[in-house]
Amino acid sequence: MKQSEFRRWLKAQGAEFKDGTNHLKVFLNGKQTTMPRHPSKEIPEPLRKLILKQPGIK
């Protein structure tokens, strides 16, 4: 899954985003996590799962 697709999916789940210097801060369910900002690149599956786990989605 490309990072831009993952970001759209997170936004549909209610996530809010704030730009960092080289990353995006993701706010969801009162928790914060970060993800790299490379919208055209594939996001590795382990990283995607970690980003979902931190705010308690999966």
UniProtKB/Swiss-Prot annotation:
Subunit structure: Probably forms a complex with the cognate antitoxin HicB 2 which inhibits the mRNA interferase activity.
Protein name, UniProt field: Probable mRNA interferase HicA 2
InterPro entries hit by this protein: HicA_mRNA_interferase, HicA_sf
Function comment: Toxic component of a type II toxin-antitoxin (TA) system. A probable translation-independent mRNA interferase.
Gene that produces this protein: hicA2
Cystines in this chain: none
EC number: 3.1.-.-
Enzyme type, top EC level: hydrolase
MF terms (GO), sorted A to Z: endonuclease activity; mRNA binding
Entry similarity comment: Belongs to the HicA mRNA interferase family.
Keywords: Endonuclease, Hydrolase, Nuclease, RNA-binding, Stress response, Toxin-antitoxin system
